[in-house]
Regions:
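C-terminal non-catalytic interaction/assembly regions of soluble proteins
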Residues: 1-157, 180-185, 192, 200-226
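Short secondary-structure capping/turn segments at boundaries of alpha-helices and beta-strands
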Residues: 163-168, 218-220
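Short, well-ordered loop/turn elements at secondary-structure boundaries
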Residues: 159, 172-175, 226
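A cross-kingdom feature strongest in bacterial/archaeal respiratory oxidoreductases
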Residues: 185-193, 243-246
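Helix-rich interaction surfaces within compact, conserved domain-sized segments
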Residues: 213-280
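Conserved phosphate/anionic-ligand binding catalytic regions in large, soluble enzymes, centered on
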Residues: 165-185
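Phosphate-interacting basic helix/loop segments used at nucleotide- and nucleic-acid interfaces
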Residues: 157-163
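Eukaryotic N-terminal low-complexity, Ser/Thr- and Lys/Arg-rich leader segments
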Residues: 140, 280-281
Length: 281
């Protein structure tokens, strides 16, 4: 969609499609959608509360839904075509025809005792394949000490991207975000600014939970002092993850990019040094 205030028109169209779909679902006796998704690519919908308030003239609408019955998705897709053709000015499409309902396929992984599994070699069971079941260790986990506290009283904000590299990806319905400081002396500053709560606030629109405190429970932070790095694990954050998710970024590949905008409080000398280096950022 393109034209003035495209993001507002796109959002209104998307909400209207779901409203019309729900009215039809109710009329034919079908239950509501189990999950819906509206993403306006180009209007910073991935940024949540941290999106910049600006009017854009061009967006791509990515709209999706889940329903227990394929007929429910059929109704949704019919409304997409009907309202798309009849209502919004400036709407264009790159695919001809109507999309089709597709099943949601999930991966279910679980552990079973090794003794439950037989080993076969050349089609014959290997009798000596029984493995003694290992026991979980009761030893207390040894975690690295936190970096030294920052002694400077006067601190100024600097974006994380000036201090670190970042990359993210998925593990099922969980996401990992790795932060590696550009220099070891930056680790303390990053560690004490980029807390679990700071990460939760940046990604709260993706994380499951009805309250911020519930969402915070899904965020864990792990320190890797040997490489001046931090890893964040966020659970229940990908809408099912992989092919089970209806989101544009089902693998959390852009989560690290969202964090790179985070303000990190640093000593003035670091800010002066980095601001003078045009190669960083």
């Amino acid at each position: 969609m393109y034209g003035e205030d495209s993001e507002k028109k796109a959002d209104y169209l998307s909400e209207s499609i779901f409203k019309a779909s729900r009215n039809t679902l109710q009329k034919v006796g079908l239950e509501d959608f189990t999950e819906t998704s509206i993403e306006l690519i180009g209007a910073e919908s991935q940024y949540g509360e941290f999106a910049r308030n600006q009017s854009v003239r061009e967006v791509a609408i990515k709209i999706a839904a889940k329903h227990r019955d394929a007929a429910g998705i059929g109704i949704f897709l019919k409304e997409c075509v009907g309202l798309g053709l009849a209502t919004p000015p400036g709407l264009s499409g790159f695919q001809g025809g109507r999309a089709r309902p597709s099943p949601v396929i999930r991966l279910f992984s679980f552990e079973i005792p090794k003794s439950f599994v037989n080993t076969y070699i050349d089609g014959q069971i290997f009798e000596d394949s029984q493995v003694e079941q290992s026991q979980q260790s009761n030893k207390q986990k040894v975690l690295p000490d936190a970096p030294p506290k920052i002694k400077d009283k006067l601190l100024v904000p600097l974006k994380l991207k000036k201090l670190a590299y970042a990359r993210s990806g998925d593990k099922g319905n969980s996401a990992n975000i790795g932060i590696i400081c550009r220099r070891p002396e930056y680790l303390s500053y990053v560690y004490y600014s980029l807390t679990e709560r700071a990460v939760m606030e940046r990604l709260s629109h993706f994380i499951s939970g009805d309250s911020l405190e519930e969402k915070l429970k899904h965020v864990s932070r792990f320190l890797l002092p040997g490489i001046s790095a931090i890893n964040f694990l966020i659970t229940d954050v990908l809408g099912g993850g992989g092919i089970a998710s209806i989101r544009n970024d089902a693998q959390g590949k852009g989560f690290a990019q969202l964090l790179l905008d985070s303000p990190i409080m640093v000593s003035q000398w670091i800010a002066d040094e980095i601001d003078g280096n045009e190669d960083i950022g």
